[in-house]
């Protein structure tokens, strides 16, 4: 790491690596500007005004599954924490599980395949290790199998990882699910008992690139946005009326303070 006329250094990667770079002797000695985009435990909140019969319920499920599987979950904006009303926890879990069961994994050039491999075998090992860490405080809903069906020729040795959904029953009393990011097709369900608790859980991510709120009531959005805006690069509000034009939870928006081509 050289001075290079004190040009800023930007880093995108894990929080552990970012912490090491931040205290690099040359960076500190020469006061080189350093910016890191590290782990982001992004969340999506299903508001408690939404019931399983509402369109918004299906929109939430669709967003979570899409963010888990697009690019095999290797996105800094992917939904890592799915915050849902405890009264609808079972319904949410079953719907997400059903959708994930239809995701065909393998060679993306083969028709019908919906999800490909991770970037490398080392990344595969890292995701497996982090899922194991998460499972110390969360139970497995689906996935997590090292031996699962793949489609395509020559894929057996690929860095594939089965879409994995976890459930943390007591997220208010658990740190790991808010701190550990498995950078792959992995998300954790977190039940809440009221909207105050939902917002508190969202803030446990210690600042995220993006958060989503799925609600059918403008008043709920008006309550949540001022409370969470400072903790997120952007807030994505979704209901049945906006769904047709929505760019989705993980779509970069270059005109905002976060996101754009070449960025998250």
Give residue spans per PLM region.
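Short, small-residue-biased leader/transition segments that mark boundaries at the very start
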Residues: 2-7
């Amino acid at each position: 790491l050289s001075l290079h006329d004190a040009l800023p250094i930007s880093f995108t990667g894990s929080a552990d690596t970012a912490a090491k770079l931040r205290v690099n002797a040359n960076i500190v000695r020469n006061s080189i500007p350093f910016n890191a985009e590290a782990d982001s435990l992004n969340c999506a909140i299903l508001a408690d005004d939404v019931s399983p019969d509402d369109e918004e319920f299906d929109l939430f499920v669709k967003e979570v599954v899409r963010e888990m599987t697009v690019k095999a979950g290797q996105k800094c904006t992917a939904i890592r924490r799915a915050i849902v009303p405890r009264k609808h926890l079972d319904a949410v879990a079953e719907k997400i599980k059903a959708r994930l069961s239809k995701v065909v994994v393998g060679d993306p050039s083969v028709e019908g395949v919906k999800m490909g491999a991770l970037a490398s075998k080392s990344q595969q090992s890292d995701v497996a290790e982090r899922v194991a860490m998460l499972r110390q405080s969360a139970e497995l809903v689906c996935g997590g199998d090292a031996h699962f069906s793949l489609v395509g020729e020559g894929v057996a040795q690929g860095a594939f990882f089965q879409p994995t959904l976890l459930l943390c029953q007591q997220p208010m009393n658990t740190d790991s699910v808010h701190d550990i990011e498995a950078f792959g097709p992995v998300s954790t369900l977190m039940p809440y008992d009221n909207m105050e608790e939902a917002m508190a859980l969202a803030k446990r991510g210690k600042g995220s690139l993006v958060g989503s709120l799925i609600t059918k009531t403008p008043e709920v959005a008006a309550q949540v946005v001022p409370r969470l805006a400072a903790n997120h690069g952007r807030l994505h509000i979704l209901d049945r009326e906006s769904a047709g034009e929505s760019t989705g939870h993980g779509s970069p928006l270059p005109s905002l303070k976060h996101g754009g081509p070449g960025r998250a």
